[in-house]
Amino acid sequence: INIYCDRFRFFSPRYQATIPGKGKEIVGDVTFNCSRWDCSFHFKHEDKPEDDKTGEKLQSVSRVKQEYRLQLTYSICERLKSRTRTSYTHYVKKERQEGGYLFYQDLMYSSLQTSLKAQFRFAYFDTDSYNTRIYAYENNVLYGYSFPALYDRGIRSYLNLNWKPFTLITLY
């Protein structure tokens, strides 16, 4: 179990908040391991001031964003793993409320005899706007990095193959 809490105050202007303000952030993680199962739950609550430009007067309003994530990993056998993740985001600013979710399924295969590795993902996401975007790390080729912001509605999938036929050669 990990818990983090931060209360902060801004005395000078910053991005999307030109008026000084204060806020808080709370993050929690719970992880449970049992034999072939791994289960983790993540929670994040942000309450930050943001500018509201409706009307002639600039004012600061509270922007609350909550994120929930549940991940289950199951070792089917020594070489094959399955990972399921579901995430939900809730956003509130003044009377405006938005939400969004992500669901993905990973299958990961690793062969010891042929030095072959395969990773497959199928993801579905549906959010109301960019405010409720959900970030999901994607496995990539060596030294490649992908951490896209998923928003609106869509399907995303990939298949990575990694084969090492000889000691000094790796094919992706």
Where are these regions (language model features)?
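Exposed, low-structure sequence patches enriched in small/polar residues
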Residues: 1-172
